[in-house]
């Protein structure tokens, strides 16, 4: 690397490139790396050569799955770029990169405008107050419309765009942009694909006559927005004085850093036009690590005690681990954002989140998947670390003498799960290693060992998410596994009280026999309150010796593991032992255990047993025009609509829907709403299954 890490933090930018799938985000990143001199040959996503798409599946699918961190230099500034995925199933990657960014470039497709995933990512960026500039890409595409895209930024995102450039020409005739600050035209001559300099040089010309009027109109809007940033500028503006270029740039920077407005640029990354002015804008308008002020955290033992760390080399060390990746040679790489202090390789740090000490191995600045070793890490930068054993995504690393916990990230609960089992005995060990590593990388995968079936279940954020999991397992860890269909966890319970069940267990087999007699009553408990089981002993006068009573209880619990209807675990039952009898020689703990178990099975059959299913609280955010379709669809899934509310530009529908009806929902929702609606789903409660559905479940369990 030609330059070392810049120590002047005013000249550092930690940015993300965020966009909808296919808006040209990876191509834009590639061009940035090309113009900043990191790459000598351009990588194109559609031939699988892009630098940041470095995992095998990404090359195949042409979508960016993991955010690789890349460092480059422009105009004497260092830019650390995090490439983020644009697919809805990978929102956790986006969340975790936004948490550690200072600013972002939002890339939009000039033909499609603001698309659903851009909406989702934009709202996530709002959550972390990330300042953004916008790049309207693909201006060379048929049907590209810059003004339409700017309009969708207002209508769909409720954001305030600051138009900084106008396109010159459109589609095949797109040749450059009008810069509204200098009021000059930047033109990339010739066919950029055949141009030897690959669009690296552009000519500065006068604005074409047909655009002069439009350019003046948009410049006035820009100057007016800037004038509002201070009384001094407002006065100057009202008196008809021209604002200087420096004043306009300072005003735009202030609006951007405060996330009050978003400068909009345009170009075609694929045709190498418009990328350099956008890089100039990253340097001119996006914040440096010092702009956000000291980083806030809390004391290790008390969340109420707020702690601060200055963004400087002198402050105590603090950093956030925001991504774990498995590297073919080094093993586990932990990506960290250093917020304060400095650290040399070999030093010891405290993982404050887990309360464990870690030793730092090698330190790198990353360029996609090439590494540049460094001797120390300093505040304000992003690095990859080797040698951390217990650190996972969202953990805080800090100076052991000055512990602090930085705000972590919130990860959603998985909405879908599949059973997975190794094809051979030899795959068993590989499978557990693979699962362990993949879960450390992505905390939205959850692993659960199903005690009822003995299978390992993997939960994730969607079907594509689980596909990629299985795919990586096969490819990176060479595990062959069978993957089952998504499953629902049903339960069984009873509806009415049974006053008295008598059961005698008697066996005579030469020598000592077995004898136990019990009398029990059973009644339903409130499952909504989470009451699973209760046992009461009401026997008087020693009719059942004290040492045998726990055995009756244990026998009932044995029987509850498999319900009488379809074999699902039972919940919500209270059992009372009323009476019984024993035999001095033939009674034993085992005899009473069997009696309890059999009495329970007999009693449950008389107590109107039913099947319960998990109900999910589903929230759908949809543009108003699809509201009817969304509600109709939820009703057809046995959903109960709970409420409908307004949010920025969308309607929010809340409903309770059985989990079994939600499989495949994401695909249906996307097709019904042109992909513009998003939903989230969390477990709510268990509820009784309608008779027709229960019959089906029982039949299925008997048929297996």
Curated annotation (Swiss-Prot):
Record-level GO BP terms: ribosome disassembly
SMART domains: EFG_C, EFG_IV
GO molecular function ontology, one term from the record: translation elongation factor activity
A GO CC term assigned to this protein in UniProt: cytoplasm
Residue ranges annotated for the tr-type G domain, each copy included: 10-290
Residues that bind GTP: 19-26, 83-87, 137-140
Annotated localization: Cytoplasm
UniProt entry keywords in alphabetical sequence: Cytoplasm, Elongation factor, GTP-binding, Nucleotide-binding, Protein biosynthesis
Pfam families: EFG_C (PF00679), EFG_III (PF14492), EFG_IV (PF03764), GTP_EFTU (PF00009), GTP_EFTU_D2 (PF03144)
InterPro entries the record matches: EFG_II, EFG_III, EFG_III/V, EFG_IV, EFG_V, EFG_V-like, EFTu-like_2, G_TR_CS
Free-text function comment from the UniProt entry: Catalyzes the GTP-dependent ribosomal translocation step during translation elongation. During this step, the ribosome changes from the pre-translocational (PRE) to the post-translocational (POST) state as the newly formed A-site-bound peptidyl-tRNA and P-site-bound deacylated tRNA move to the P and E sites, respectively. Catalyzes the coordinated movement of the two tRNA molecules, the mRNA and conformational changes in the ribosome.
Similarity field: Belongs to the TRAFAC class translation factor GTPase superfamily. Classic translation factor GTPase family. EF-G/EF-2 subfamily.
Official protein name in the record: Elongation factor G
């Amino acid at each position: 690397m030609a330059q070392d890490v810049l120590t002047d933090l005013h000249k550092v930018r930690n940015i993300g490139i965020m966009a909808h799938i296919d808006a040209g985000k990876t191509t834009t990143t590639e061009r940035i790396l090309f113009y900043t001199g990191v790459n000598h040959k351009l990588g194109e996503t559609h031939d699988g050569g892009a630098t940041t798409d470095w995992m095998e599946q990404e090359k195949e699918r042409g979508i960016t799955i993991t955010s690789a961190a890349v460092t480059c230099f422009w105009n004497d500034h260092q830019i650390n770029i995090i490439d983020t995925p644009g697919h809805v199933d990978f929102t956790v990657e986006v969340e975790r990169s936004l948490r550690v960014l200072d600013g972002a470039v939002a890339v939009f497709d000039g033909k499609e405008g603001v698309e659903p995933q851009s909406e989702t990512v934009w709202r996530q960026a709002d959550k972390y107050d990330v300042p953004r500039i916008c790049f309207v890409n693909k201006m060379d595409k048929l049907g590209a419309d810059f003004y339409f895209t700017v309009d969708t930024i207002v209508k769909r995102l409720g954001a305030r765009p600051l138009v900084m450039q106008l396109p010159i020409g459109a589609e095949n005739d797109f040749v450059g942009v009008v810069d509204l600050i200098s009021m000059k035209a930047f033109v990339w001559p010739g066919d950029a694909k055949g141009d030897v300099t690959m669009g690296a040089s552009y000519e500065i010309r006068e604005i074409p006559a047909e655009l002069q009027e439009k350019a003046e109109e948009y410049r006035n809007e820009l100057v007016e927005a800037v004038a509002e940033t201070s009384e001094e500028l407002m006065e100057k503006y009202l008196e008809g004085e021209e604002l200087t270029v420096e004043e306009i740039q300072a005003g735009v920077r202030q609006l951007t850093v405060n996330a009050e407005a978003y400068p909009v640029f345009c170009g075609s990354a694929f045709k190498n036009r418009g990328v350099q002015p956008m890089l100039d804008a990253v340097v001119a308008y996006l914040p440096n690590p010092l702009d956000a002020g000291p980083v806030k955290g809390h004391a290790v033992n008390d969340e109420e005690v707020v702690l601060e760390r200055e963004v400087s080399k002198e402050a105590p060390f603090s950093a956030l681990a925001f991504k774990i990746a498995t590297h073919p040679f080094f093993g586990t790489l932990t990506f960290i954002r250093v917020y304060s202090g400095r650290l040399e390789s070999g030093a010891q740090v405290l993982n404050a989140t887990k309360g464990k000490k870690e030793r730092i191995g090698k330190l790198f600045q990353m360029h996609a998947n090439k590494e540049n070793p460094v001797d120390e890490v300093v505040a304000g930068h992003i690095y990859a670390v080797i040698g951390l054993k217990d650190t996972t995504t969202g953990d805080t690393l800090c100076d052991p003498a000055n512990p602090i916990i930085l705000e972590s990230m919130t990860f959603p609960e998985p909405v879908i799960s599949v059973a997975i089992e190794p094809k051979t005995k030899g795959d068993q060990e590989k499978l557990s290693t693979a699962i362990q590593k993949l879960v450390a990388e992505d905390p939205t995968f959850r692993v659960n060992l199903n005690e009822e079936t003995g299978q390992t279940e993997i939960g994730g954020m969607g079907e594509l998410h689980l596909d990629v999991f299985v795919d990586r397992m096969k490819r990176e860890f060479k595990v062959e596994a069978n993957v089952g269909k998504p499953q629902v966890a049903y339960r069984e319970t009873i509806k009415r009280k049974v006053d008295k069940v008598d059961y005698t267990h008697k066996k005579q087999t030469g020598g000592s026999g077995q004898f136990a007699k019990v009398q029990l009553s059973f009644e339903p408990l409130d499952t909504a309150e989470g009451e699973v089981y209760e046992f009461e002993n009401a026997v008087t006068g020693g009719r059942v010796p004290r040492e045998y009573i726990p055995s009756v209880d244990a026998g009932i619990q044995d029987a509850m593991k498999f319900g009488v209807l379809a074999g699902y675990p039972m919940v919500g039952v209270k059992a009372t032992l009323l009476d019984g009898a024993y035999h001095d020689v033939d009674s034993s703990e085992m005899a009473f255990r069997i009696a309890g178990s059999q009495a329970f099975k007999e009693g449950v059959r008389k107590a109107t047993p039913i099947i319960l299913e998990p109900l999910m609280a589903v929230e759908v955010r949809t543009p108003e025009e699809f509201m009817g379709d969304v509600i109709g669809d939820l009703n057809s899934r046995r959903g109960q609509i709970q409420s409908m509310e307004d949010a920025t530009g969308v309607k929010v529908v809340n409903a309770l829907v059985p989990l079994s009806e939600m499989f495949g929902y994401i695909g249906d929702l996307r097709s019904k709403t042109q992909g513009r609606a998003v939903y989230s789903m969390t477990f709510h409660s268990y509820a009784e299954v309608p008779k027709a559905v229960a019959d089906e479940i029982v039949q299925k369990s008997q048929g297996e």
